[in-house]
UniProtKB/Swiss-Prot annotation:
This is L-glutamine:2-deoxy-scyllo-inosose aminotransferase. The gene is gntA. One of its GO terms (molecular function) is transaminase activity. Its cofactor is pyridoxal 5'-phosphate. Pathway: Metabolic intermediate biosynthesis; 2-deoxystreptamine biosynthesis; 2-deoxystreptamine from D-glucose 6-phosphate: step 2/4; Antibiotic biosynthesis; gentamicin biosynthesis. Keywords: Aminotransferase, Antibiotic biosynthesis, Pyridoxal phosphate, Transferase. Disulfide bonds: none annotated.
């Protein structure tokens, strides 16, 4: 008899889950203001009022208690801007985690450098500092650390390594908006913090991004790189003039945020701390409930003082269930929950199907881009056994968390139905 919903059985839940993205109060008014402002981008003519983009940049910098923020069109753009602002280019190597979204590797290749994936810590699933140390060569031009899912990486060790070798550390905070390490917001420890505001993120405008830095010179380089070689004007321009100055200091590309996106982000930012607190409370319930089923929750580094959840993540410890693979288990759990956002972990970077530089003509002749030869045993294990739950589910209530636990319990009890 078939019991699992994924095989045609009855699901344990039919109610819908919290909708994400959820607009902040006043979002429609803000969008209407942009719509009728005569200015839809930072590159549009000044209309006597500071752009939403510059207002968001100031607010995001203040949120992080840091001097500078440069908005960008996406998280990928923010990482590309940070890499190039740090001087990374042709022939350089950039250390990245072996477990992360594909953009960390493809963006490094996009600046004509070579991604070097290293293994992750089995508890945090973030960069293993010892593996980073072993991977450094004379060609290493940057280290990209990703604060993955809900964990903050070991920034004490990683900043020490970067400083000792005089290599820029770039924090990819696309999954860690608002997290704190030793009471400082993440993104403020390296040369740059980079952020994504893509649809699924806890701070979103559909697409978007930003870089933050405490270094005025790096910020100025970032401004040039994302606005076709232009920077913000130091003084208020006249009505009808540009709020961007053509300096001819550094050639750039167009990776700017639109005024619509910036207007949305200003409202969303005001809700972030409150939403993160709700996610933390529900994550604690999952830690207890799913932990009792033999799913080991991801932990954060000891210096973490405020954790945030892009996704709750945990490793299935039972060998009999774990060997089935999260690629089968996650959809089965989601089916029990009427399509809740339950996913398998990212695949390891040495087996990531989305990373295919050989399919792009621009990468011909660049040696070292094939990552299949790297050994990443911890990342490979995570790809087989780590399951994740998107933060939108964590905006529910205690009964929702109980449903998630019940769904896993049912799938685990009937896991033999999933064997091929």
């Amino acid at each position: 008899m078939t019991l699992l919903a994924v095989n045609g059985g009855s699901p344990i839940r039919s109610q819908q889950w919290p909708l994400w993205p959820a607009p902040a109060p006043g979002a429609l008014d803000a969008l209407n203001e942009v719509l009728h402002s005569g200015r839809w981008a930072i590159s549009g003519p000044y209309q006597g009022k500071q752009s939403f983009e510059r207002r968001f940049a100031a607010a995001f910098a203040e949120f992080h208690e840091i001097g500078h923020c440069v908005p960008t069109s996406s998280g990928t753009a923010s990482l590309m801007v940070a890499l190039e602002a740090c001087g990374v280019g042709a022939g350089d190597e950039v250390i990245i985690p072996g477990l992360t979204w594909v953009a960390n590797a493809s963006t490094v290749a996009g600046v004509n450098a070579v991604p070097v994936p290293v293994d992750v810590d089995p508890q945090t699933l973030c960069l293993d500092p010892a593996a980073v140390e072993r991977a450094i060569t004379p060609r290493t031009a940057a280290i990209v650390v990703v604060h993955l899912y809900s964990a903050v990486a070991d920034l004490d060790a990683l900043t020490a390594i970067a400083e000792r070798h005089e290599i820029p550390l770039i924090e990819d905070c696309a999954q860690a908006h608002g997290a704190r390490y030793r009471d400082r917001r993440v993104g403020t420890f390296g040369a740059f913090g980079t952020f994504s505001m893509q649809h699924s993120k806890v701070l979103t405008s559909g697409e978007g991004g930003a870089v933050i830095t405490g270094d005025a010179a790096l910020s100025r380089r970032a401004e040039h790189l994302r606005a076709d070689g232009r920077t913000y004007t130091p003084d208020e321009p006249a009505v009808g003039e540009m709020e961007l100055a053509q300096t001819a200091e550094l050639m750039g590309s167009n990776r700017c945020l639109s005024e619509f996106q910036a207007a949305l982000l200003l409202g969303q930012l005001e809700l972030l701390d409150e939403q993160n607190e709700r996610r933390r409370a529900n994550a604690a319930l999952l830690d207890e409930g799913l932990g009792a089923l033999g799913i080991q929750p991801q932990v954060s580094s000891p210096g973490t003082t405020e954790r945030t959840y892009y996704e709750w993540a945990g490793r299935i410890e039972d060998d009999g269930i774990g060997q089935i693979g999260v690629e089968r288990i996650a959809p089965a759990v989601a089916a029990e929950l009427s399509g809740a956002a339950i996913y398998a972990s990212y695949p390891p970077m040495n087996h990531n199907r989305l990373y295919q530089p050989a399919t792009r003509a621009r990468f011909k002749g660049i040696a070292g881009l094939d990552l299949t030869g790297y050994s990443l045993p911890v990342a490979e294990d995570a790809g087989q056994r780590v399951v994740t739950i998107h933060h939108s589910a964590l905006l529910g209530d205690e009964s929702d968390m109980k449903d998630i636990v019940r769904a896993f319990e049912k799938v685990f009890a009937n896991h033999r139905e999933l064997r091929g």
